[in-house]
Amino acid sequence: MATDQKRGLLIVFEGLDRSGKSTQAKRLVESINKKSTESGDASSSPSAVLQAFPDRSSSIGKLIDQYLRKEIDMDEHALHLLFSADRFSKNQMIRDNIAKGIDVICDRYCYSGVAYSLAKGLPEQWVRSSDVGLPKPDAVLFFDVSPEVAAQRGGFGEERLETATIQQKVAAVMPTLRDDAYWKTVNADGDLDSVEKNVFRIYENLDREKPFESLEKI
């Protein structure tokens, strides 16, 4: 990394299914790249990239996608490790982009993996250990919406984990994963534009000067 170039940021969007996080993650990437272009940045590289987890286009992600779409069944322990493997497959990509000064915006990350596996009753210590060593986010934006409101939004129920019972359990687990040092709560009940402005305010106040770290615990 050039000495005069600040590193990129790793920002994670988390929340229940249909909480609006995917839409807002895309909007943040678009806003960052638009602002960079308007400021006269002549670089051919984007200023921000979006990474969704699972990556359903990868070989690992395709298996996960088949499970989520109810096309295949799978042991829950194997599924948890597949989700972790999917994230680790992007480990170097994330680190390389951060080193180049490119922000990486993740639609879900290890916290979803932990929350869903705990909601399904897998052993806590084992579940929490499988993602240790991944890049540590500079911020986790948790989209706060009730399971009841999320269930009323379009598309809910199309995939295996989109059930009221699982979503309620995940909603109960997520706060136990929170680290106030870098977790931020976003009220997801507002309109798209107001939520987007709130997200961008959080983004603009993040610190690029602090060292980039790896997760030591979850």
Swiss-Prot record:
Gene Ontology MF annotations: ATP binding; dTMP kinase activity; nucleoside diphosphate kinase activity
Superkingdom field: Eukaryota
Involved pathway(s): Pyrimidine metabolism; dTTP biosynthesis
Catalytic activity: dTMP + ATP = dTDP + ADP
GO cellular-component term (any): cytoplasm
Pfam families in the record: Thymidylate_kin (PF02223)
Alphabetized Gene3D superfamilies for the sequence: P-loop containing nucleotide triphosphate hydrolases (3.40.50.300)
Calcium keyword on record: no
Protein's GO biological process: dTDP biosynthetic process; dTTP biosynthetic process; dUDP biosynthetic process
Keyword Nucleotide-binding among record annotations: yes
Positions that bind ATP: 15-22
Protein keywords: ATP-binding, Kinase, Nucleotide biosynthesis, Nucleotide-binding, Transferase
SUPFAM superfamilies: P-loop containing nucleoside triphosphate hydrolases
EC numbers on record: 2.7.4.9
NCBIfam families according to UniProt: DTMP_kinase
Family: Belongs to the thymidylate kinase family.
Purpose: Catalyzes the conversion of dTMP to dTDP.
Protein name: Thymidylate kinase
Organism listed in the record: Caenorhabditis elegans
